[in-house]
Amino acid sequence: MTQAADTDIRVGQPEMVTLTIDGVEISVPKGTLVIRAAELMGIQIPRFCDHPLLEPVGACRQCLVEVEGQRKPLASCTTVATDDMVVRTQLTSEIADKAQHGVMELLLINHPLDCPMCDKGGECPLQNQAMSNGRTDSRFTEAKRTFAKPINISAQVLLDRERCILCARCTRFSDQIAGDPFIDMQERGALQQVGIYADEPFESYFSGNTVQICPVGALTGTAYRFRARPFDLVSSPSVCEHCASGCAQRTDHRRGKVLRRLAGDDPEVNEEWNCDKGRWAFTYATQPDVITTPLIRDGGDPKGALVPTSWSHAMAVAAQGLAAARGRTGVLVGGRVTWEDAYAYAKFARITLGTNDIDFRARPHSAEEADFLAARIAGRHMAVSYADLESAPVVLLVGFEPEDESPIVFLRLRKAARRHRVPVYTIAPFATGGLHKMSGRLIKTVPGGEPAALDDLATGAVGDLLATPGAVIMVGERLATVPGGLSAAARLADTTGARLAWVPRRAGERGALEAGALPTLLPGGRPLADEVARAQVCAAWHIAELPAAAGRDADGILAAAADETLAALLVGGIEPADFADPDAVLAALDATGFVVSLELRHSAVTERADVVFPVAPTTQKAGAFVNWEGRYRTFEPALRGSTLQAGQSDHRVLDALADDMGVHLGVPTVEAAREELAALGIWDGKHAAGPHIAATGPTQPEAGEAILTGWRMLLDEGRLQDGEPYLAGTARTPVVRLSPDTAAEIGAADGEAVTVSTSRGSITLPCSVTDMPDRVVWLPLNSAGSTVHRQLRVTIGSIVKIGAGS
């Protein structure tokens, strides 16, 4: 069970109190609730409204106990333990037992007999406690109260008001944890019910948690409703693949098909919460375009159609093509692969292909970022943890919007601000809704001005806070697009002594970094340029030497492929639309003589590949993700045996391919990869210095122009959300954000259409007038009607044209 919400024993030795429960003395920290003290003794007091991560409310009254000296039973979930208190639970007190039976009878008066068809049946606290702490029959003979059922809270959450027992778990979660007022208690007395605000848009990223913590079947998920009973399902622990938060999850499946995912209980990471994307976006792995067999070009013709073939034949064709291009092959690895798979790509590139041309950053990036990662992040023990965020004297965010880019970081920062008064500052163009929910403070900055803003913080009130032990600076991957941004963040950390954390958006990026999938890094954060580091890797891999010259980054690989300097590409799980210029990526693939793709589903990359190998989704393979903290999150396959897909883990495909090329890769299993990585360990030598890139400062747009800024929303047009229409239904409405003066300059009013354009395309969306710097325009990067990279062919920091109308 997660640490009780009412107890804070983080610092020093807590003051203790001693009480007696059912005749047994127990000492607990001062402030502990009676219900928690009973739990420590193994006594389970029935309850519905109580939740260890929510503030106590005493709404359901089911946890009544007898307390010596009190005139009537007290709710144990709101009663604080005190010295010499004597408590008797339902196990030893007839008064407590009778009170609990009476409350249960009242709760069941209007509760429908839906158990045979209710989704909660079989895992329902009300069902279980009605049996253990309720009457065997009902004395109520009148007609039960009824409501229309169900009503839509959102596209993915349904409310059955007849089943609701008014425990207020859902409303407290929305208010206390998520900060989204999407559900509340309405009316009073016998008319009281849970409802939504008619004039408020439903825009919570965390609504699915209310379904999970509902103690009855009042809140259900649209996608799972009437699909299965809990006792029909097999449950497997898993790890979320959608972002770098590293959430523990539970995957429930039946007959080889995943039916639902729930948040796992991990107090050190996601506590008991997850975001809606992690909960519901899993159907992408069962779409009709999933690749189920290896593919090659018909008759070996580069322009021929892709046709199914055997694994052995596909291996032979791929081995022949890659062997012919040895030393002239680039490796592009997406940021979604596991730690072990990334290691296999890094090792395959070096010893099988003889190249350091490998990069996991299939997105806008920079050489400065590579230097920053090598100097500050790779091969280092966990510098900042989730717990550190709660105890920090200050947290500074730059190039990072946690609610959209790492939702569990957002929840932890909101908790830190709300419960521990941790001040959160962000360097950004405007204050987002997420920042308001964290009670955060904005350091308003023009895109490109982040380095100057960071330098200015070295002195003053914020600088003093950052100089306090435990202070944290969190940088997102978007800061890589600002020249001098990461250098300034590192400089500020050095000046103040603050700890530095890097939060990528994708689940596999930190693991790929630690695995050495960068052109200048070897596994464990070893610098490629260091002779000792290369010697260590050579010894571990049982080879004489490694290629010593620094390789090309992703942009360099694509440019070299486009001009035919490179003869082949090995591509693992990239999306061209993630790059600033998707057309350039596709042109590079078209120009490459030989392309091997390892992919889950058909894509623009597989259409251009000469050999395609199907790879398995996370539900069908073992592996590990490394989250933003540097914490290793291992998982086993949830689905075993025969399924619809015949894909293998990337490392198994690469191991077999290396064998066909006459090279022993040595990673046929995740255990083998982990053993090698453990033997190598992290680099204990000198890390590269840097980065030291000078800032160029923000550009100056003319009238009718603006600097583009933006980020990807959590719920957008990403392919990992394919097949989940209910989730897409609650994505936030895409808008163009402009300052009042900029909107007036182009003659646009709030809500009117604004067009953002370049010489290569345009985007038209409603205008949202926002308090932000002038001649700056914000767009969601990959939402419906606003796929910036595909439509504009530029990325953030570029100058674009803006105008009213379409």
UniProtKB/Swiss-Prot annotation:
Which positions in this protein are listed as binding [2Fe-2S] cluster? 49, 60, 63, 77
From what superkingdom does this record's organism come? Bacteria
Per its UniProt record, what Pfam families does this chain match? Fer2_4 (PF13510), Fer4_Nqo3 (PF22117), Molybdopterin (PF00384), Molydop_binding (PF01568), NADH-G_4Fe-4S_3 (PF10588)
Q: Does the keyword Iron-sulfur apply?
A: yes
Q: Which CDD domains match?
A: fer2 (cd00207), MopB_CT_NDH-1_NuoG2-N7 (cd02788), MopB_NDH-1_NuoG2-N7 (cd02771)
Chain residues that bind [4Fe-4S] cluster 2: 164, 167, 170, 214
Q: What is its EC number?
A: 7.1.1.-
Main EC class the enzyme belongs to:
translocase
What does UniProt give as GO cellular component?
A: membrane
Name listed for the protein in its UniProt record = NADH-quinone oxidoreductase subunit G
* The species this protein was found in: Mycobacterium bovis (strain ATCC BAA-935 / AF2122/97)
